[in-house]
């Protein structure tokens, strides 16, 4: 989903996906469900990955979250500002982000009932874009209703509008779609992982 409408250049720095049977241990010694590294590696606990994919409306999807980080890492700033082709658009988004992030942090502090973006987004600004990505795809109608300006920015960033999607499809239907489209996608794609180039 995250690469469907954006340039493959957004992920050209990504090269390795590691799944762990148990909770992986980060460099600081903490166990966590997963993380994305600026150098191009994503590490995730398999069960957390599976659970996130099996429930499309719980606002928790580890894979969407970590790939959101990877998208943010393209410009090496780690600031919840993904790549924009236009410098003017990037500046507009940065100004919007400052206000929106402060407002969501305040909403969580005051418990105003407008916390559609999960609290983890307020722990560090670098987590904001990834948590918003999860909400955008898993609770799109709620984000559009409660945070319309933020939703409109995400539509612009991902170039899709999930609140308008007619319905969710089952895992079996998605798998059929993958099989039907895979050969054509591979034929048209110029993207290859670093592993394939080695």
Predicted regions and their residues:
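Metalloprotease/metallohydrolase-associated module, dominated by Zn2+-dependent proteases
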Residues: 4-5, 22-54, 77-198
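Short glycine/proline-enriched turns and hinge-like loops at secondary-structure junctions
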Residues: 11, 54-56
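Generic beta-strand structural signal
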Residues: 15, 40-42, 60
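Active-site recognition of the HExxH zinc-binding catalytic motif
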Residues: 58-75, 130
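"Short basic amphipathic alpha-helical interaction patches in structured regions
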Residues: 17, 30-32, 57-60
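Extended cationic-aromatic binding surfaces that line active-site or macromolecule-binding grooves
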Residues: 1-25
